[in-house]
A protein has these predicted regions:
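Conserved loop-alpha-helix segment in the C-terminal half of the alpha/beta-hydrolase fold
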Residues: 230-266, 272
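Alpha/beta-hydrolase fold catalytic core
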Residues: 1-42, 64-67, 107, 134, ...
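Conserved alpha/beta-hydrolase catalytic His-Asp/Glu region
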Residues: 147-152, 165-227
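Active-site loop/oxyanion-hole signature of alpha/beta-hydrolase fold enzymes
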Residues: 10, 20-21, 64, 70-113, ...
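Short beta-to-alpha linker loops that shape the active-site pocket of alpha/beta-hydrolase fold enzymes
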Residues: 73-78, 142, 266-267
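Conserved HGGG/HGGXW glycine-rich cap/lid loop of the alpha/beta-hydrolase fold
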Residues: 26-82
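Catalytic active-site module of serine/aspartate enzymes centered on a nucleophile-bearing elbow/loop
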Residues: 257-299
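Flexible "cap/lid" loop of the alpha/beta hydrolase fold
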Residues: 123, 127, 133-164
Length: 299
């Protein structure tokens, strides 16, 4: 979760439900700035306990660089529908197919950006079919399972969800402090937004948290598979990360032959810790990616 989520989108952005072959998904769709040449479209996937609002502070600086940005709530996240208690609906393969349906509904090839858990879902989508995508950026998202310390926090959360209501669990999270992958009500931007963080938590389906929390603790290393995919890769993180230590992300970037960016002064959520620097690094990468024609699906 990005703890500094901003719930007020830019003035020109549209919040709506994106209709896809796999259902509707809540999105914030922010256009290219007036007078700026359009360069491409970006599909943004949030992390565990997060939502599309985690990318709010990136929309305007990326629009100024020529990029339309579409941030999405995945199945069962915040304002997107999903089963309340059936974890099977949140299997990683199902979430990956949702991403392919989302990009198809946008009607154009897109740069894919996944934060944390969203990066692992993005990786799974690209491994199913890379052809709808122009590039893949993994933001604070590592090669395999999360660190032992974060696994322990996620287990605490999953245990609490087995016996408590979402509202009761939220109160426990406040008492726990701000773990990177559990998500606490840390500062939000603007009056009333801490309460909106609570509303986001209450809108998230318990089964989504249980299933994806388990995925974070068991995800295998699929970097070798990903490296065989013919896409440009970008590994971006803050200067400190307890979920996937920075040296692990450095090594993953080498294995992927990826561009590597470390955002000074940022931790697990550079998108909210240092949005201007993060947007600049993202746009610099995308500016250098050639737009190739659609090729045959990856097998």
């Amino acid at each position: 979760m990005s703890s500094n989520a901003a719930f007020t989108p830019p003035p020109d952005a549209r919040a709506y439900r994106l209709r896809t072959a796999r259902g509707e998904f809540a999105v914030v769709d922010s256009p290219v700035a007036d007078g700026v040449e359009a360069k491409g479209t970006v599909l943004m996937l949030p992390g565990f306990t997060g939502s599309k609002e985690d990318f709010t502070l990136l929309h305007e600086p990326l629009g100024a660089r020529g990029y339309r940005t579409v941030a999405v709530d995945g199945r069962g996240q915040y304002e997107s529908d999903g089963p309340e208690h059936d974890e099977a609906g949140y299997a990683q393969a199902e979430l990956a197919r949702d991403v392919l349906a989302q990009v198809a509904a946008l009607g154009t090839r897109a740069h894919l950006l996944g934060h944390s858990l969203g990066g692992q879902i993005a990786r799974a989508a690209v491994l199913l079919d890379h052809t709808p995508f122009v590039s893949l950026t993994l933001m604070s998202s590592g090669p395999a399972r999360i660190s032992v310390s974060q696994q322990q926090r996620v287990k605490l959360l999953r245990d609490a969800l087995d016996t408590m209501t979402m509202a009761e669990v939220w109160d426990v999270i406040q008492a726990m402090g701000p773990p990177e992958e559990v998500g606490a009500p840390a500062p939000a931007h603007g009056p009333g937004e801490p309460e909106r963080l609570r509303g986001r938590w209450l809108g998230t389906r318990p089964a989504q948290l249980l299933a994806t929390g388990r995925q974070l603790c068991t995800e295998p290393d699929r970097v070798g598979e990903l490296a065989a995919v013919p896409l440009p890769f970008h590994v971006l993180s803050g200067a400190y990360d307890d979920t996937w230590p920075v040296p692990l992300l450095d090594e993953m970037a080498v294995r992927l032959d990826a561009r590597r960016t470390v955002i000074a002064g940022a931790e697990h959520s550079p998108n909210t810790d240092r949005p201007e620097a993060t947007a600049r690094a993202l746009a610099d990468f995308w500016d250098g990616v050639p737009i190739r024609p659609r090729s045959a699906p990856h097998q």
